Amino acid sequence: MKVTRKRAQRERRHRRVRRKIFGTPERPRLSVYRSNVHTYAQLIDDIAGHTLAAADSREVGEAESRVEAARKVGELIASRAREAGIERAVFDRGGYKYHGRVAALAEGARAGGLKF
């Protein structure tokens, strides 16, 4: 499958998911982005259009694998959410399948105390 077609499919899935979920200041959207090398996460207040907290795999240091790095990103975003007074979030998988790095990030965030 060509890269452009895969990206178009992911963007369609993301638009479909985004129609249903919305972040508020009390329960922001935990948005995930995956590049080939790194994993990024943001807590977004969609009403104000502001990012409340962010973390990425460049900050967590060395990891054995990209999945392990994503789990550490989840734990880091959960700790930053606690610092900002956020306990709950809406998980936005960004059109990616809930598998591998995306699932590891979600599990790490849950292990860090974030609820969704």
Swiss-Prot record:
* One term under GO cellular component: cytosolic large ribosomal subunit
- Identify the species of origin: Rubrobacter xylanophilus (strain DSM 9941 / JCM 11954 / NBRC 16129 / PRD-1)
Pfam families in the record: Ribosomal_L18p (PF00861)
* Record CDD domains: Ribosomal_L18_L5e
Q: Which GO BP terms apply?
A: translation
> What family, per the record?
Belongs to the universal ribosomal protein uL18 family.
Q: What is this protein called?
A: Large ribosomal subunit protein uL18
Q: What does this protein do?
A: This is one of the proteins that bind and probably mediate the attachment of the 5S RNA into the large ribosomal subunit, where it forms part of the central protuberance.
Query: Which key words tag this protein in UniProt?
Result: Ribonucleoprotein, Ribosomal protein, RNA-binding, rRNA-binding
Q: Does the keyword Transcription regulation apply?
A: no
**What gene name does this entry carry?**
rplR
Which molecular function terms from Gene Ontology are attached? 5S rRNA binding; structural constituent of ribosome
Subunit: Part of the 50S ribosomal subunit; part of the 5S rRNA/L5/L18/L25 subcomplex. Contacts the 5S and 23S rRNAs.
